Amino acid sequence: MKSVSVSRRYATALMLIGKEDGNTDQYRKELDDIVQFFDANPELEQTISNPLYDKNDRKNVLIAVLDKGGLSKVMKSFLILLFAKARISFIREVCEFYYSLADELKGVVHATLVSATELSSDAVEKIRAGLATRIGKDIVLDVEQDPSLLGGVVTKIGDLVLDGSVKTQLFNMRETLKRGESA
């Protein structure tokens, strides 16, 4: 739980800087680049994060990596601050929170569309456009399949679930019939 609040705080701070200097998209890309770099080089990330190694040596390794990465001065300072506060291991969580803040700033919402069968791109686009009109924001849809739905679709937008599946409709009919029998 602590990592969540800490990551949110750092992501928010970077977002405020990005809003101020107009570089929110650049910082998003740079965060993504550094996470991809750490994913490709887990030993390096472990070395930088491991307190058993000398702190100055780890910092020098981080600075060398950042210098070769072509990152902005703000991003280098941000990552060095994360390191100095022993928070560099939270970089993925910071990146996730930053993504959500950047999307919120742009009026973009991520949603999941689950269907029993594969939907045509035309159908997906119509659903996306309808959702965007209803909530007044741009929608990025992740499309998934779940044959257990039998038919229809389920859409999840944050905490909101719009369930138009045959499975749920059959369940609701069964519950209604049960109540009708006992009445």
Swiss-Prot record:
Q: Which UniProt keywords apply?
A: ATP synthesis, Cell inner membrane, Cell membrane, CF(1), Hydrogen ion transport, Ion transport, Membrane, Transport
UniProt family annotation = Belongs to the ATPase delta chain family.
Q: Which domain of life is it from?
A: Bacteria
Task: List the GO molecular function terms.
Answer: proton-transporting ATP synthase activity, rotational mechanism
Can you list the GO cellular component terms from the UniProt entry? plasma membrane; proton-transporting ATP synthase complex
Q: What does this protein do?
A: F(1)F(0) ATP synthase produces ATP from ADP in the presence of a proton or sodium gradient. F-type ATPases consist of two structural domains, F(1) containing the extramembraneous catalytic core and F(0) containing the membrane proton channel, linked together by a central stalk and a peripheral stalk. During catalysis, ATP synthesis in the catalytic domain of F(1) is coupled via a rotary mechanism of the central stalk subunits to proton translocation.
- Write down the HAMAP family for this protein, in alphabetical order: ATP_synth_delta_bact (MF_01416)
Organism of this sequence: Desulforapulum autotrophicum (strain ATCC 43914 / DSM 3382 / VKM B-1955 / HRM2) (Desulfobacterium autotrophicum)
* SS bonds (residue pairs): none
- According to Swiss-Prot or TrEMBL, what is its membrane topology? Peripheral membrane protein
Q: Where in the cell is it found?
A: Cell inner membrane
* Cited Pfam families: OSCP
Q: What is this protein called?
A: ATP synthase subunit delta
Encoded by which gene? atpH
Record's subunit section? F-type ATPases have 2 components, F(1) - the catalytic core - and F(0) - the membrane proton channel. F(1) has five subunits: alpha(3), beta(3), gamma(1), delta(1), epsilon(1). F(0) has three main subunits: a(1), b(2) and c(10-14). The alpha and beta chains form an alternating ring which encloses part of the gamma chain. F(1) is attached to F(0) by a central stalk formed by the gamma and epsilon chains, while a peripheral stalk is formed by the delta and b chains.
